[in-house]
Design a protein with these regions (language model features):
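DNA-contacting interfaces and partner/effector-binding or oligomerization modules
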Residues: 1-48
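Short alpha-helical segments that sit at the start of domains
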Residues: 69-99
Length: 170
């Protein structure tokens, strides 16, 4: 007998999958995640924790009951729908200032008010950025503020977008 426990989500973030992994009961069979799109980082978290996944782009990874499936590298068929916040773009000056401040001391626990005053922006802008950082498991919300928990991954993701060149044609 072979049981598969599937979790279907409209949107998935690394923080979401980490919570699912914590809650799952391994004795109840193999767990899989199904979502419209699963990022490379989320996929890696799934694989590292033995959780299968399938997305609408055709990316998948599944190991269970003598079955092995793996397909990677397919692009997101609807990228604009999945990425509503462009925090890393060069045009996101405020986000860039906040991120630079966070990287000044990644061991520190940051308060929204302090960050907003330090970079001269609204608390709402800082809060919006922190929400995205928490969803992606780069920052953790603590009782007394926010702490960067995965600076390497955050910096890598930021550098991917920040390094893109704009192409202008006339």
């Amino acid at each position: 007998e072979f049981h598969i426990n599937a979790c279907f989500l409209n949107r998935v973030f690394p923080s979401t999958i980490m919570k699912l992994i914590e809650k799952r009961d391994k004795s109840q069979g193999v767990s899989i995640l199904v979502a419209p799109y699963i990022s490379e980082r989320t996929a890696q978290i799934c694989e590292d924790n033995g959780m299968g996944y399938f997305d609408y782009a055709g990316n998948c990874w599944f190991v269970g009951h003598s079955i092995y499936l793996s397909e990677k590298g397919n692009k997101n068929p609807r990228p604009k729908e999945q990425r509503s916040v462009f925090i890393f773009e060069k045009t996101s000056v405020v986000s860039s200032c906040i991120l630079r401040e966070l990287f000044a001391d990644v061991t520190k626990i940051w308060k929204l008010k302090y960050l907003s005053e330090k970079v001269n922006c609204s608390i709402g802008q800082v809060s919006k950025l922190m929400k995205v950082l928490v969803e992606n498991a780069w920052v953790e919300k603590m009782p007394d503020g926010y702490k960067v928990i995965d600076p390497e991954s955050l910096l890598l993701e930021w550098s991917k977008d920040y390094g893109k060149k704009e192409i202008t044609s006339y």
